Amino acid sequence: MAVTKKPDLSDPVLRAKLAKGMGHNYYGEPAWPNDLLYIFPVVIFGTFACVIGLSVLDPAAIGEPANPFATPLEILPEWYFYPVFQILRVVPNKLLGVLLMAAVPAGLLTVPFIENINKFQNPFRRPVATTVFLIGTVAAIWLGIGAALPIDISLTLGLF
């Protein structure tokens, strides 16, 4: 049996909070024990059951065994390493390529410090973070597509 606290709408404190858009956590069903003991385990076990069921019903194929005597002409990494592979392929100096790869997470770590004074969560009111995200996404897609192309057109994607 759940214990719920019904809202007292004649309470002036609650009415003031509701007028400001607050107060939704002031009343309602408590998280303990209802959510934590009953709902969360059902969701967790249901997720595990779905994942295990899908892995049993449709296992992923591993593919052909590798032949060390028949190497392909161009060896490409997995798709999620394409932007990093393209950076290493395009930059003439390998040390500079490694430094550029290290600059990506270092630049992402500086974004919260740049916008530390900004209290908004809306992306349109956080111009620095939104700009860094958009430029980074476009650059990663550009480098990822270029890594799958031949080296002579990989930087321009054959467009220019």
Curated annotation (Swiss-Prot):
Pfam families noted in UniProt: Cytochrom_B_C
TM helices/strands, residue ranges: 36-56, 95-115, 131-151
SUPFAM superfamilies listed in its UniProt record: a domain/subunit of cytochrome bc1 complex (Ubiquinol-cytochrome c reductase)
Protein name in the entry: Cytochrome b6-f complex subunit 4
Species this chain originates from: Chlorella vulgaris
Primary location group: plastid
Cross-referenced HAMAP family: Cytb6_f_subIV
Keyword Metal-binding: no
GO molecular function, one term: electron transporter, transferring electrons within the cyclic electron transport pathway of photosynthesis activity
Gene3D superfamilies linked: plastocyanin oxidoreductase, Single helix bin
Protein location: Plastid, Chloroplast thylakoid membrane
GO cellular component: chloroplast thylakoid membrane; mitochondrion
